[in-house]
Amino acid sequence: MNQKGTVRLKALVLICLPLFLIATPVPVAVTEDDRQDRIESEAAEKEWANTLVSKVAQSNGTGTIKVSAPAKPTLRRMDNEEDEVISIECVYYDEMECEKSGDCEITKKTCYSEAHLKAVGCLAVFGLPTQEINSTEPYLKVDKPQYKSLGCMPYQHADSMNCENESSCRQGRSFRGGIGMCCCSTNNCNMPDLIEMVNPSLKKDSDNSALLWASTPSNMDLESLDKFPFYWIIIIALSVILCIALLILAYVGWKFQQNKKEEIKKQQKIKFDMEKTDALEAGNVPLVEPEEEMIEMVETPKELPITDFQLISKGRFGKVFKAQYTPDSGEKRLVAVKKLNEFQKASFLAEKRIFDELNEYPKWYKSIVEFVCAEKIGDEYWIVTEFHERLSLYELLKNNVISITSANRIIMSMIDGLQFLHDDRPYFFGHPKKPIIHRDIKSKNILVKSDMTTCIADFGLARIYSYDIEQSDLLGQVGTKRYMSPEMLEGATEFTPTAFKAMDVYSMGLVMWEVISRTKLHQTDEPPNYQMPFQVIGFDPTIGLMRNYVVSKKERPQWRDEIIKHEYMSLLKKVTEEMWDPEACARITAGCAFARVWNHIMSSPDSSEGYHSGSSMKNRGVDDVEQSEKPEGIEEMQHYHASSPSKRQHPSPNPFFDSCPPPPPIPVILENGGILQPDNAEPEPEELPDLPIVEKIYDIATNMLFSREELDLMNAQRQVEYEAGADTRASTPTPSGTFGTFTT
């Protein structure tokens, strides 16, 4: 053990030893108050039982037995939340009700403990036979004609009421008038086949001797009471000590992990400095060191060198501004500032965590929006990234049609960004990284640069996947409803990195459909107006509607005939369909999708033209592309990602040389900062916030899953129906958990 481990062990011993001495229990005797409480409790429960028997055993002139209904305990909840309510299901029968109304059916009822009688058991009162029975068995079954009353009774201690039996209701007491009584403590233990009486032949004086219950407990009961608290104090004290020890161990482990992370960061810093020195000596471009100090969030208000704010968009949780950023170097640049309110703090922290992770790598990947800083300014949370004048892919496609060459560059660059996020070792990065799950891929979260390449943005719902840490928050049903994968809509996601990545791939397939649908294939082609995926079912569909359409009916966005017949675009259509396959395990990965798109786009000899026809394409079959799982000739792409943005262009065909060049940027900004929308603009779909996982509880009565709120409401309704006499579950077992408190 090293020196640090020894210090930690000594500290743990010094902390635990005083706690152990303080919490060690000392034997204590029962106080007079405890003794008096025990006496009063037993007296109350025995008085209740004697009252019940006195009502049952009343002799008339003929010597027969007249039966009255037993005093059933009131079914109610305890007002004090600290009092535990115990419930039990017992068989119910009343001879008087049978004689009066003719309802002689044996039913079942649920009873609850109440007041100071903390427990409740099942009860049977029956008549003892007057004739001698020729049997040597100590206990005999009680026949139905002997039943006087079946139900339940509250009690304080099972031993004083002879309720220790669990499997059957066996006679423990007899009373004057030839009446026997038994008590048991499990559900339905007083069923007809389980009621037993003492053989009167073996105890002839049972009818003449009254075994009445005492009004005070015996000396043995008081002695057992003296010992009872001592054992419980030991158990409770040891439990407290164990909990404290576990908390201390957890804290020590957490501190150890923090120290370990700091040591790893120091080693990475030393390694980075060595790599930077080697790069300078070799004459290469020096590596960029992550600016960790600049992006640390502070709780105190501070100012950023950002001016000239111009509103771009706003929503329920924040606003996005175009602004001018002037760092210490004095070189001004346009940035996008996303200002979030307090309700979106979790989204801010999640996005900042992703950018912190990406900022630790030696270089920034060009298919991810470039990060500037993240700060808390006043009561707002700011995320500052690079600004792109073409705004989002959604804005571009909604207002313009594009050429095939523009579509090629858009599709290639956005899938390039997704494969970078997902893969441990991306194609053109050269460094290992942790997988990142975006969880909200859509056309609004993909920005279009001036050269028609794209970058992925908005990481408020993204998570870093760690193979050695369980992350239950990845199972939440989050994202934009119309872009949710079938398994997300169905709530049947596997807890594997492949399954989480497949959800992003599905969403990216829908974005590819949006791009291809707005692509002009030839001079006379007229693409239809922009439509969001699944717009046929409404602008703001519910989760249930999406589940029925996508999961049950397996519907997908429809292709227009021109796309299906077009030889070049039909292969991109096939890749898209493989990305939105209903089965998550059958979808291709983002890396595979990029390889197929790259090989298809870069293999066309006439890809630099504005439009493609079947005759101008290289005759390349789909099967040939499917066999190429890795991009071919990717040296240009590697150089592109290794260079600065201004030194090398994207290796895909340049859309600005097309006969149908890209549309100009969107400069339509009003004086108040809002984007000018056309008159027939569609309403924006709502996004689902990152909600916590809803606990689902199984209800046996309905064989369905419900939330705790739904189940509490259902439980209250059942209780009202029961108290009103509307219970119709006669002769059938009441499902466990139907009454009382539901637990998971």
UniProtKB/Swiss-Prot annotation:
One of its GO terms (cellular component) is receptor complex. It holds the Pfam family Pkinase. Residues 620-639 have a biased composition (Basic and acidic residues). Residues 605-686, 724-744 are annotated as: Disordered. Keywords: ATP-binding, Cell membrane, Developmental protein, Glycoprotein, Kinase, Membrane, Nucleotide-binding, Receptor, Serine/threonine-protein kinase, Signal, Transferase, Transmembrane, Transmembrane helix. Pharynx, intestine, hypodermis and body wall muscles in L1 through to adult stages. Also expressed in head neurons, ventral cord and tail neurons. Subset of head neurons show coexpression with daf-1 when dauer/nondauer decision is made. Residues 48-253 are extracellular. It is a single-pass type I membrane protein. It is found in: Cell membrane. Residues 1-31 form the signal peptide. SMART domains: S_TKc (SM00220). Glycans are attached at N60, N134, N165. PROSITE patterns: PROTEIN_KINASE_DOM, PROTEIN_KINASE_ST. ATP binds at I312, S313, K314, G315, R316, F317, G318, K319, V320, K338. The active site is at D440. GO terms for biological process: BMP signaling pathway; cellular response to growth factor stimulus; dauer entry; dauer larval development; defense response to fungus; determination of adult lifespan; egg-laying behavior; innate immune response. Belongs to the protein kinase superfamily. TKL Ser/Thr protein kinase family. TGFB receptor subfamily. This is Cell surface receptor daf-4. It comes from Caenorhabditis elegans. The gene is daf-4.
